[in-house]
Amino acid sequence: MLTIDHVTKTFGDYKAVDGLDLDIPEQQMFGLLGANGAGKTTTFRMILGLLSITEGSISWKGRPVNYHISNKIGYLPEERGLYPKMKVRDQLVYLARLKGMEKREAVKELGTWLERFNITDYENKKVEELSKGNQQKIQFISAVLHKPELLILDEPFSGLDPVNVELLKEAVISLKNSGVSILFSSHRMEHVEELCENLCILQKGKPVVQGKLKEIKRSFGKKNVTIHSDDDLRFLQSHEGILQWKETADGVKLQIANEDISQEIFAMLQGKGFIRKFELEEPSLHDIFIEKVGAVYE
């Protein structure tokens, strides 16, 4: 388990992280979210030992996080850091050896990953010769080649088309199922919803939402209603329980104050026309983020 115990990081008078407490169990994906400047990257860098901790402590399986256990951690940063003039094979084997992996094992493991991502033909090409998407695959391999126990992923699907996003998702899920603990950050809330059971949303270095995603959604109160109809539904706008109204190509999407309002809206629709779809939904993570942080995630 990764334990972040009342961690604070200051830069002069500025608190980038303020008394953060997190427990991330083994074999689980944990989402760490927040707008720009919320403290995510600072937290990642303290876990990696790249930044000192002002107050508190961080431990992995009961041992303080420091240089001696850094080989057990993999990190895919948002800012890419590959050597553009270096060949793929030479670069990845070199990085794995820096993490304590034997060359023979690194070469064997590299072959497995290149084949998995359908990029075996690029083994002896320079990184700068690859497309942005394939560079992202190489960057991902660099974070996992040494078989880390803890993996930190910051925007791992950036620059990938939908097919390759699914390919990387499958790899991430496979790593989790093999026992790797994963700390995950992304501005694509649908990816976080799909992959993470637990999460924390930071604002100004402090958690504003924390816990199991299902429980967070359940306790949020507000619900969404999707209605598909070709009829004029604007008469529903008079209902005080409707908080947001958004017209779509198929009808309308509403945010309502609570679940009971949906029954009242459904009753109002009776005899008013043909309704192809009426669906009550939990709030999305995007809805919760906007409500709690008050900004669009960028």
From Swiss-Prot:
Every copy of the ABC transporter domain together lies at 2-229
**Record's keyword terms, sorted:** ATP-binding, Cell membrane, Membrane, Nucleotide-binding, Transport
Q: Which InterPro entries match?
A: AAA+_ATPase (IPR003593), ABC_transporter-like_ATP-bd (IPR003439), ABC_transporter-like_CS (IPR017871), ABC_transporter_ATP-binding (IPR050763), DrrA1-3-like_C (IPR025302), P-loop_NTPase (IPR027417)
Q: Which GO terms describe its cellular component?
A: plasma membrane
User: Does the entry feature the keyword ATP-binding, yes or no?
Assistant: yes
Task: Return the SMART domains for the record.
Answer: AAA
MF term (GO), any: ATP hydrolysis activity
How does the entry describe its membrane topology? Peripheral membrane protein
For the ligand (ATP), the binding residues are: G34, A35, N36, G37, A38, G39, K40, T41
The UniProt family comment states: Belongs to the ABC transporter superfamily.
Query: Which PANTHER family does the protein's record reference?
Result: ABC TRANSPORTER ATP-BINDING PROTEIN, ABC TRANSPORTER ATP-BINDING PROTEIN NATA
Q: What is this protein called?
A: Uncharacterized ABC transporter ATP-binding protein YhaQ
Its source organism is: Bacillus subtilis (strain 168)
Gene that this sequence comes from: yhaQ
